[in-house]
């Protein structure tokens, strides 16, 4: 509302409802519909100027610094009527209060044979996506947290990989490059550059994150008409940016 102070409380409530309420849609269908809203949302009327059906910019893509970015640790979402009372993703990244990234972090120990796969399973559970639970007629997550989701991130030790809400376990990838070069001027917190730093400095930098959402995220049909969400990999993004320049 900082750049659109004309929005009334009623209109803000309506926009909030549009992001959360996607009746009779699968998570992927809801995600695609909400992504369209992130590019072009509308309300009935500008009550100050009288303009009908004005466009509302939920995110300012042209001026990333004008948006509000928050990272919330241990973000709790109550899930009444589900197998567990709540879900608590390790980190959720918000832009203007809209959750775009959900991160699950695991610790390597003797009890976890494959912590990265365990993180993937946890991300599935958070969005009620585990087939065995669905087939049993049970609910264990809150899909609405993922209506606006751009990226899922799983991390353990020095490893860190990203995917989308349709990515299988084998289709999570590391972001292996920091670009532009100006972002390399930082001090790794542990004195060594791990995959976490590469993803944070590269993909999760505010202007890059919003640029990837706006220019490098697509929904497409593949084998047997199955629809998926795809986000570019680091080499594709860098090549595209260099062509534009």
Where are each of the predicted segments found?
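ATP-dependent helicase/translocase motor core
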Residues: 1-245
């Amino acid at each position: 509302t900082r750049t659109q102070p004309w929005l009334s409380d009623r209109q803000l409530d309506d926009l909030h409802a549009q992001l959360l309420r996607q009746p009779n849609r699968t998570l992927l269908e809801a995600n695609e519909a909400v992504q369209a809203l992130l590019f072009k949302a509308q309300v009935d009327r500008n009550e100050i100027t009288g303009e009908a059906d004005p466009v509302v910019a939920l995110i300012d893509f042209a001026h990333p610094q004008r948006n509000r970015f928050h990272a919330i640790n241990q973000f709790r979402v109550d899930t009444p009527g589900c197998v567990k009372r709540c879900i608590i993703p390790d980190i959720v990244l918000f832009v203007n209060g809209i959750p775009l990234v959900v991160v699950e972090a695991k610790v390597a120990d003797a009890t976890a044979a494959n912590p990265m796969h365990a993180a993937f399973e946890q991300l599935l559970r958070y969005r009620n996506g585990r087939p065995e639970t669905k087939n049993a007629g049970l609910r264990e997550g809150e899909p609405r947290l993922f209506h606006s989701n751009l990226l899922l991130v799983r991390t353990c030790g020095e490893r860190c990989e990203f995917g989308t809400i349709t990515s299988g376990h084998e289709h999570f990838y590391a972001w292996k490059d920091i670009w532009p070069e100006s972002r390399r001027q930082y001090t790794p917190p542990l004195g060594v550059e791990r995959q976490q730093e590469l993803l944070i400095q590269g993909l999760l930098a505010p202007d890059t994150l919003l640029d990837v959402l706006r220019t490098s995220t697509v929904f497409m049909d593949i084998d047997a008409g199955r629809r998926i969400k795809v986000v570019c990999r680091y080499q594709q993004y860098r090549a595209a940016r260099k062509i534009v320049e």
